[in-house]
Amino acid sequence: MTVITIAKRGLPKLTTSTSSTTTASSSSTITSVVSSSSSSSSLPLLSNSTSSSIIPSITPPSRNGNPYILDSGDMPNGTVFIIVGGIAGVIFLAILLWWVITTYSSHRLTRSVQDYESKMFSAQHTQFYGDSPYMDYPAKENFQDQVHISESDISPGNKDESVKDALVSHTNNEKPFLSNFERPLSSLVSESNRNSLFISPTGDILNKTRLSKLYQESPRLLQKPVIMTSDNVSTNSLVSTISSSSASSLDNGNEKEVGEDIRKPAKIASSPSRKLLNSPESDGSVNRNHSKGNLLVVQSKRKPTPSTYLEHMLEGKEQDE
């Protein structure tokens, strides 16, 4: 440890002398001032000390004969970083490839769905939906666009042949009959309880149950032959098939259920196909057919539900009591 002592230093004293001489006296004065100042001042003494430390050098063990030391003499520098970077790159490429495949498959699926919907909702398929322009056609086209036979146009000799031709055309045109059968029924789903802000949950449930019954009976009804009515008109429309099914079901004791299936949807929906059932001409023809036993339409004895009554009241319809 080095101790540094600091001594107090005094101020130099200046002495002046007056002389009448010239240069010699002035030089002696300067000499005396310098000598007096140097003699009276004392400077501190500084001592320097140095310290040194020994750092040992690390020497790795030799790889010769040591199985626990990897000999990396043949490997390049940064081998570990290269391996880690390669693994990360492979993972990134796998994720990118998965994203490309998923996007492509989703795009193809979307295109196929769009093509399917464009085909299903085209003009030739929209007749099965409630918002179809086919629903705005007159009821005559909905029910009487098939085979029409009248005795005024048929001679007595060709009457049997005309009936056979009508039966053959009825069998061949089974698919158009199915479209005409589904066309008025589709209005029950789209137009029922949708003409006002009031929605009847019970009415929707009843309509769905009636629709399911009618769709279940549709294959059996469409296989029936053409019925010749008393006014010499071939009634192979939906009214004749449903009415004939009601006539056959009366013999089996199902009068009440068939009557509800026929009359209740006609009161709910307001499409042209439903209005045909309530028209005076159809009522007159039904009464004539009822008198001869060809067509029977059973009036429903069940009173309308409160929700249906309110709906008709909001729509301004008169209730039949």
UniProtKB/Swiss-Prot annotation:
Positions of post-translational Phosphoserine modification: 132, 282, 285, 291
GO CC terms: cellular bud neck; fungal-type vacuole; membrane
Origin superkingdom: Eukaryota
Region of interest (Disordered), ranges: 35-59, 241-321
Composition skew (Polar residues), residue ranges: 279-288
InterPro entries: PRM
Localization in the cell: Membrane
Topology of this chain in the membrane: Single-pass membrane protein
Organism: Saccharomyces cerevisiae (strain YJM789)
Residue ranges, compositional bias (Basic and acidic residues): 253-264, 312-321
The UniProt record lists the keyword Transmembrane helix: yes
Transmembrane regions: 81-101
Annotated keywords: Isopeptide bond, Membrane, Phosphoprotein, Transmembrane, Transmembrane helix, Ubl conjugation
Compositional bias ranges of the Low complexity kind: 241-250
Protein name per its UniProtKB record: Pheromone-regulated membrane protein 5
Cross-link for Glycyl lysine isopeptide (Lys-Gly) (interchain with G-Cter in ubiquitin), residue positions: 317
Source taxonomy: Eukaryota, Fungi, Dikarya, Ascomycota, Saccharomycotina
Family: Belongs to the PRM5 family.
